[in-house]
Structure formats: C-alpha cells, structure tokens
Amino acid sequence: MRELQKLFDRIIQRVNVNLREHNYDVNPFVQNLIPADKMKKFYGFYGITPYHPLNFQFRHSNLSGSHFLGKCRVTNSLLYKSDIRGDELKRKGDLFQYQDFQIPVDADEEIEIEESFLIKTLVHCFSHDPETLERFFIRDTISTHYTNIHGSPINGSFLGPFSTIDLTTMRDCVIGAFSYVQTGEVNHLNIDPGTVWIRNPDEFNFLYRYPVDRLNNYIYFAKGIPP
C-alpha cells in the first residue's frame, strides 16, 4: 500500500509540473476518487488471439481490473478498470496515409503508458500522429471516469470524466468534463467542461459549449467530489 501511495503521489507531481502554466493542481480532484483497497482487489487481464502480436510488459504498475489486448507496455502507472485495446494498432509494413504522404510503418505499433493514472478509461484505435507512427503514448497523464482516448497520443494532461479526445495529439492540456475534442493537435490549453470542438485546418472550425448550469444536472465534477 505504501508503494501505491508513493506512485500515486509521483504521478500527481509529474502532471502538475506539466500543467504549471495553467496554475492547475490536479491533487484535490483525484484524492479519494478510488479507495486504495480497491486498487489491490482486482486482477489485470490480457487477451490472446491468433490475430494480434503477443507482447505485454508492465513494470512498477498496478493494473486493477483492467483489460489489455495487443502490444502494450505499462510503466510506473496506475490503471483502474480501464480497457486498453490494441486490436487496431498498425503492423510492420503497413502504409500510413497522411495528406500527400504515404509513410511506411517500420515496426509493430505499441501502446505505451508511462507515469499515468487512468480510471475507467477506454484507449483504442491507433496513433494518427505521423511523427509517432509506431508509438501510441500516454505519458504523465491522469484520466478520470469514462474518458475515451481514441487514436490520440497524450503527454502531461488531465482529462475530466466523460471527455473524449479523438484523433488528436495532446500536450500539457486540461480537458473539462463531458468535452469532445477532435482538432489534430492541441497544446497548452485549458478547455472548459462541456466543450465540443472539431477543427480541420483551412476547412472548418466548429466550437460549442454546453451551458454549465444545464451540464451540471448531468455530470458534475469538482474538487473533493467524485463525478
């Protein structure tokens, strides 16, 4: 239990360092979200099929109640009842189409989770970032209940409950509850709860925010209060 607490504190500190420009402290939001005894109550599960590479590594991590499929690596992380689906990862020899480029994939793609805390989070699809074709990474990140990370490498971010990051590389961002972001890339932003933002550069930019007073009737997340 002591090691779990040390790892938990380490992850919080790393996320806070990444979010320092927002003056955002994740600690009050994540304390007591998951009782510590539940983190040691459940097993982790790894799926084996004849169609996906058998490659799973985890080190200094807790995988309580989480499911994994495909090529995955977890380091210094806490996962609680999360689904890490590697069934759509790119394979060595594939060609990735990006704009006018056809980029060859040099190795089987891997989901890499490092220094992160994922709570009931779904991670699936594959990295759509042409700069990281073989690595679908989630680093120094905390995601809360029912977050959906769809083909989106993430570094140094905090994701509120019921938020979705879709086909977007994200660095050093805060994503409010019940938000949907599909913009290709976002950096150093604090996105309000209930935001729907879809952008294709030079094509369109759609932005909508649910009224907070109405949103709070359905999903409310604040310091010290579980969603």
Label the predicted regions.
Residues M1-R139, Y146, G151-P153, F162, ...:
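Terminal amphipathic alpha-helical/low-complexity segments used for targeting or macromolecular assembly
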